[in-house]
UniProtKB/Swiss-Prot annotation:
Its main location: cytoplasm. UDP-N-acetyl-alpha-D-glucosamine binds at residues 10-13, 24, 75, 80-81, 102-104, 140, 155, 170, 228, 334, 352, 367, 378. This is Bifunctional protein GlmU. Residues 252-459 are annotated as: N-acetyltransferase.
Amino acid sequence: MTTPTSILILAAGQGTRMRSSLPKVLQPLAGRPLLSHVLDTARSLDPHRLVVVYGHGGDRVREAFPEDDIRWVHQAEQRGTGHAVQVALPETDADDRVLILYGDVPLVRGETVRRLLAQLDEGGDLVILTAALKSPTGYGRILRDDSGRVQRIVEEKDASDSERRVNEVNTGIMAARASDFTRWLSKVTNDNAQGEFYLTDCVALANTEGRRVEAVVGHEAIELMGVNDKRQLAEQERAYQRREAERLMVQGVTVIDPARLDVRGEVEAGRDVSLDINVILQGSVKLGEGAKVGAGCVIIDSEIGPGAHILPHTVIEGAVIGAGASVGPFARIRPGTHTDSNAKIGNFVEVKNARVGEGSKINHLSYVGDSELGRDVNIGAGTITCNYDGANKHKTIIGDRAFIGSNTALVAPLTVGEGATIGAGTTLNKDAPPGELTVARAKAITIPGWKRPVKKPKE
């Protein structure tokens, strides 16, 4: 039987180097708070207990994560990582495996920490996660004896010159039994340069007891690095986006430039999808096989059908785009929109909460809102559905094969029948019968001899 795992996430730091009123763990990475990414990793391990230690910006942090699987522990005074773990341990059972994660280390992978827990199960009493860095400045150093065994961790402020030359660093992530952490932390003092209770002192205490201290070296240094300022936040953002681009490319997606793709949610993509530069995919996005997304497009919580073509600089939110449809360039598709197969929405068109039938076209310079269009409808340039009367929204229904002339205003609620034609320049405020031409247009008048006004001479 597997020993239950409790995961403690330390998220109480103030993050002064961020120079922000937003608590550090709420800073956005790929459109979500740093802490959200760590919680995803923690939940992938199916923990017995999930405990978050919070402090700075307490209520804001808790309100951002209302999920009921989190146990919140308040660290009123930030007295170091050892103290943070100490206040959280009462939420665990004595025999639990306890894994320590950090709210500002967002890219750690589930498989990496599984290696840590496996080492604990194989006989380690304390297992720490380390990284080898070319530039280890700012991190605690891992000190080993001549046989390679970990002896202790020294924080940079307390390290000698020779110790600072060590490039294997502590990530802070570690695992041990709850009862062992409780015993070791009861012996930790704050006799150090920062006057804090260091969690890392557990390494030396475990060695003093003759316990087995193991180190697992992370494969990818960036996933183990913390975020302390906006520069590091930007570095982590790029690392996350590289990871997402690689994941998509492995699945058969063509990413024109992996450095210019932003994924801010969950993306499912079929084979032979193509993503041009500066595309942003946000929320839950599904891209059907062979779909093409042009440069500068933003797609939010939407589904793009197989073979659909989204032309450059189009924004799509909360919509379903049918197979083979074409949208853009410079189109805006708002929530509630559903286009059927082979529909076409062209440049400078806005569509909101509308159904656009198979093969229908809204080619340019139009607004279609709260509407239902049948098959093979043609909407001329400059057509506006007048859906709002100042208090309520009203629906426009346009039947199959209807033709709406340019510069037409459709004052909802109304229905345009199948095969009807609406003459250009019409303001339509009543239903139009099927198969007939309906026109509402003032007669053109020519005024003989009319002259333009002459400007008065300047005084």
